[in-house]
Every structure is written in C-alpha cells, then in structure tokens.
Amino acid sequence: MVSFKVSLVSTSPIDGQKPGTSGLRKKVKVFKQPNYLENFVQATFNALTTEKVKGATLVVSGDGRYYSEQAIQIIVKMAAANGVRRVWVGQNSLLSTPAVSAIIRERVGADGSKATGAFILTASHNPGGPTEDFGIKYNMENGGPAPESITDKIYENTKTIKEYPIAEDLPRVDISTIGITSFEGPEGKFDVEVFDSADDYVKLMKSIFDFESIKKLLSYPKFTFCYDALHGVAGAYAHRIFVEELGAPESSLLNCVPKEDFGGGHPDPNLTYAKELVARMGLSKTDDAGGEPPEFGAAADGDADRNMILGKRFFVTPSDSVAIIAANAVGAIPYFSSGLKGVARSMPTSAALDVVAKNLGLKFFEVPTGWKFFGNLMDAGMCSVCGEESFGTGSDHIREKDGIWAVLAWLSILAHKNKETLDGNAKLVTVEDIVRQHWATYGRHYYTRYDYENVDATAAKELMGLLVKLQSSLPEVNKIIKGIHPEVANVASADEFEYKDPVDGSVSKHQGIRYLFEDGSRLVFRLSGTGSEGATIRLYIEQYEKDASKIGRDSQDALGPLVDVALKLSKMQEFTGRSSPTVIT
C-alpha cells in the first residue's frame, strides 16, 4: 500500500471567490491561477463540521468539461490531507449533477459507507474549453446544493485563508479504470473508488418509471424518438437508458459522446443552441433537416440537469411541461401512484401549474428562483413535482433538477396516453395532442421572456424604481394601460415578490416586481447581475386564456398588446436605449 505525507502550503486570499447556489464559475484561466482552486476547496472544508470531513466519504466528479481531470487530482490530494476517509469518483470524472444528488442519497459502499457531500465540477449550461468556463459547487448530505449559511461561510473563509494541507506525494489516480485504490496516510487509510457513472442513476430511474411501458412505446413503428446531449455528460447515460434499457435505435441519439469542450457548442437546451435537434424536429426557420421529423425530441445541458421537450414541429414551454407532468403524474408514473404531496414553481414561471394544483386539490408553492427553495419543501415532505421557466424540471427523488427524469416523465405520459394505440391500430396521441388537450382542460398560459443584457446598471435600477413607484397608485397604472391598449385587463394588484419559507421561516426579499391582472395575466420584471458589465433586465409576459376557441394562436401574436403595455409602462426604451431585447424566449 502506497503511503503519503501531508504538507502545509502557505497561501493568501484571492478576491472574487463568492459562490452562489450554483457554486463558483469563472474562466478556466482564472481557476488555473496558483492556489485558486486550492483556496476555494480548503475554504469549503473549513466551512463544514468536522464529522463531514474527518473520516467522511465524498463524491468528486462533474460534467467532464476542460480542466476537470486536473481539478479532481487536486481535490483528491486535499481530501486525503484533510482526513477524508474515501473519495468516490465517476469513471472518467463523469457524473451528471442529478446523478451526484442520487448517489449522495442512495449509494451504499461495499463497507456500508454513505457520502456526506460532493464537489461537483460543472459550469452547467456555460461553454467549456481552454478559453471558456469552469465551475465547482458543493452539495450537502441531502443531495442538494449548499445553502446560503454554508456558501456565506465558504466566502468568508476565502477572505482569510492563510494555508491549506495537501498530500502532494499522493500518486495520480487513474480515473478511467473502475476499482478501489488504497493509500496510507498520517491519519490512517484513504481510498479512492472509481465506479460506473450510470449504474446508481439507472437503478433509481427504473424504480420510478415503468420501463416496460416506455419500451413498448419506443418499439412502436409509428413512434420515433430523438435525444440530443449537446456533447454534455448526459451522453454517459443516454446510450445506457434509451438504447440498452429501452431499445431505442442508436441513430436516435445526437451528440451523445461527452466532450470537454462540448464539441465547440453552447450546451444550453433551447431553440437557439440545440440547432441540430431543432432542425431534425422540423422547428428551424433556416435549416431543413429533410425527411419526416420524429414524434418526440429532447435535449440536455452540460451537466444534464436541464431539459427541453419537443414534439414534431412543436415546442413545449418549460412552464407548460411541469404543469402537464403534474397533471398526469399519478396515472402515468408508478413513483407517484399514491398521489402528489404538493407542487411548486419559481415565481417567474407561468401560472399553468397553479391551475393544475387548484383543479386537483394539491398544495401549491410559489418560490424565488433557485432550486434550494424546492429542496426545503421536499425535505419537509411538502412537494413532489416542481419546475422553473429556465428549462429546469424535477421531483423529490433527488434534490436537483433532473433533465433525463423529465424526458422519462414525458415518455411515460406518452406511453400512458397511447395504451390503446400500442395494443391496436388507433391514431398515435402526439406531444402536441397532449399539450392542446391540457390547454382545453385547464386553459392556456401564453408566455414569453425578454432579456435585456448588459444594460447600464444605473439606468436599470431607475427603471425598477419607476415600476415600484407606480405600484403605489393602481388607478394611475390602469389609466396608463387603457391609454396604450384599451382591451388589456386592469391590474388587480402589484407588489415586489417576497417569500417566507414555510419550513425554516427565512425571508427572501426583492425577488422581482409583479403586476397581476384581473384576467390572470402577469408582468414580471427582474434585475440580475449588477456587476461591472452592467445589468440584465428580465421581463416575463404571461396571458391566461380560458376560451377554447382562442388557445391555438401564435404566442407572440397573442401577447402583442401585453408586450406593448409592458414596454411602455416601464419606459424600457427610454431607460435602456434599446428598441428590442437581446434574447426572446
């Protein structure tokens, strides 16, 4: 058995190491600076209680982006020096963020060990490569991201750090070969176990979904399927789940070989960046893939926690997706057969889920943006299904959003709706059919998001200030609105969203400005990133339509009057100098 020594390395604080819920994300060249990664890792160890470090088991893996392998070798050496008993690493450093959450919660080592936390190496949907982004975040023993109480401690520690211990003579660990490597250190034995990236996650998915019914759907000649991993870590699971377990043809997988630079692309599953899938599904305005599009398509981001769902020539909004999953979960997904504990969405997400909750008599929660708020509700047994408009959907099986889970949920719903079709020769119920039937039952929430990026920070704050000031006089607001578009409904209430967590009582203020209309429509304004590169203003526009004869309109056409009201009420062009947004979703 190879032995190692521990040495103390002197260091000094490095500015700008403040982690968010999504951890610390910077350019690779920043992480490669002397002591940059080491300082942050040690600051994290110092923020944890002793029993979470000494003698503990930690998971260290990520989405496989550039610099991951070097980072893992450094973290392993520091874990050994800090008295960690064992480190679990996904083969070739690959573990999706949802899989890490599942492994913390579910995996038991051969010696009975359970993980107390994880370092996840990802910058999510940000590009990867030598000149692009790297990231690191810490997840706790519940499988969820570190709460602010921990991330605040980490940040404080980065401002005072003077030294860190490291086992510099620990040999490089071969993370490409499955097995356990044991070492002997000053505090005793230290193991590094490299294991199959997919086994634990696949086992969990098979306990949630009826794989046989999905397999039957995928084998049906008229049902075609396409999945695009955008060269992210989802590729490590896609072949195993969709091809080996469910019998889909290999040709149904796009970009499913994980690459450290994501093939030079932007691993963000939306209509802009998942170009190849969008073209194949018949939704591209410029690129025709040729042939008949598949019936179902889906994409993932770099670390596989986000998802985009598509039908043939049909886009499912994330807001509709979570509502449809919640409405069909009990009948279509065995895990939910005894009922849902509750549902939740982030505040900017459309109110489609609210209508489902009201109709089905479910507990409903509206939370600020950030998955940790869902995690609190789930830990307390109050929420089963949740989602956000930024392509994140999940359930209480783990404490992260889960892209492949969302795909399997949709395939389960399709299999459930097509039971009779698969047994006979009836017409296939499509993704579009399911969405339109949902709208016919619950009404449609027309929805769009306008992003104004790199706006002057002062001007952005002034715009938000105007919107807060207007809220003090709703008669004046309604007078302005009638002058812009008389047919738009009156504003019933307006506020700045504030959330009191029903679990721990914590209060989150200034989470966005809301204008709520009498007909269920909403305008939401949020400000983010007031840094040196300016601010981003996000404008969310939503209109509720119950009239079945009006639910088939083009979204931008239906929202036209409300968009006009939002832009003129906020004086968007006057404050920003922009005649159009940077991005429309």
From Swiss-Prot:
Cofactor stoichiometry and binding remark: Binds 1 Mg(2+) ion per subunit.
Catalysis performed (reactions): alpha-D-glucose 1-phosphate = alpha-D-glucose 6-phosphate; O-phospho-L-seryl-[protein] + alpha-D-glucose 1-phosphate = alpha-D-glucose 1,6-bisphosphate + L-seryl-[protein]; alpha-D-glucose 1,6-bisphosphate + L-seryl-[protein] = O-phospho-L-seryl-[protein] + alpha-D-glucose 6-phosphate
Modification Phosphoserine occurs at: 124
Claim: Metal-binding is one of the keywords in the record: yes
UniProt: alpha-D-glucose 1,6-bisphosphate binding residues: 25, 124, 305-306, 369, 388, 390, 401
EC numbers on record: 5.4.2.2
Cofactor needs: Mg(2+)
Signal peptide boundaries: none
Molecular function as annotated in GO: magnesium ion binding; phosphoglucomutase activity
Biological processes per GO annotation: glucose metabolic process
Protein name: Probable phosphoglucomutase, cytoplasmic 2
Source species of the chain: Arabidopsis thaliana
